[in-house]
Amino acid sequence: MDVFLKLLQKDGNIVYSPVSISLSIDMIISKKGYIHRPLSPYTNYNEDTISIASRIYGDCNSLNKDPCICMDCIGDMFVLVDFDKNHKDIIDDINKWVSERTNNHIDTIIDNIGDNTKLLIVNAAYFKSSWEDEFIKEYTSIEKFWYNSTEFILVPMMSNKDIYSYGYIKDSDIKIIEIPYKDRRFSMFIPITKVYKTLCNIITIDKLAMWTSTMNLYEVDIKIPRFKVESSYELKDIIGCINMEYYIREGTELNTPSGFRHKSVIEVNEDGTTASASTCCCVADSVSNKEFYAYSPFIFYIKDNTTSDFLFVGKIISPM
């Protein structure tokens, strides 16, 4: 969330994968010890749902003399290269590897390598899964999506009416909804409010936990825009805002990499398999129907309901 708050300052749409970044950080060690946390449980997960690609490229002239990577811990995720030569070959190898690992959804993550590079962490993440309850394409209509109180664009707005976990925080005038994917292990959460900047100013991990604690099952009339977002970041300057105490053993020091590049893609549309909602209907409050219309900029996050990992976090300023 620290990284997300930093990225919120950027204009336009954003998406990034906290779990992918964490996986890369897990592979870095210091000269006095090594950072060790179990590798991501998603590296071999169903590729139709989530694919994460992470690799470290280390300079052979530097790391052989002064190693800062535990090669035994990461195996083929580490590649020795000569950053003083063959930049094009290294770039081609990186992009080819990422493309293969993400089923060709991400074909280019890097187009140049800076001078004096000694260590380059590359990761890419792609997520696509079917909704548990599909959005019927025939119900999608062109509606207004408001940038602000005076400017709007016309976008395809998906709609559905079904049983969803929904919460309303009265003092902040915030609505939040959970939209589960087909196996219910993963869900997209969307908090919205009338004034988007208000949400940006108050959002924290604790607030998200508090908001989700208010959620109950209701019949909800939901409308969200169809969107596809692709984002790419150089995280070396942002990485300083991460709370490294989560990653680092006592007495170790983190060696800042020369480059830390991250790219994520997420696509949200009507597609999905139809699944039974009968298990929810029996506990739904059918008397109090709710509305959830995302007609203006919003934040979203995809969460693993089993591990509580944040797989993807982002904001939508313009769905088109």
From Swiss-Prot:
Q: What Gene3D superfamilies does the entry give?
A: Alpha-1-antitrypsin, domain 1, Antithrombin, subunit I, domain 2
Q: Name one GO molecular function term.
A: serine-type endopeptidase inhibitor activity
Cite the entry's keywords alphabetically.
Protease inhibitor, Serine protease inhibitor
Superkingdom, natural source = Viruses
Gene Ontology cellular component annotations, sorted alphabetically = extracellular space
Q: Does the keyword Protein biosynthesis apply?
A: no
Q: Which family does it belong to?
A: Belongs to the serpin family. Poxviruses subfamily.
Protein name per UniProt: Probable serine proteinase inhibitor 1
Query: What gene name does this entry carry?
Result: SPI-1
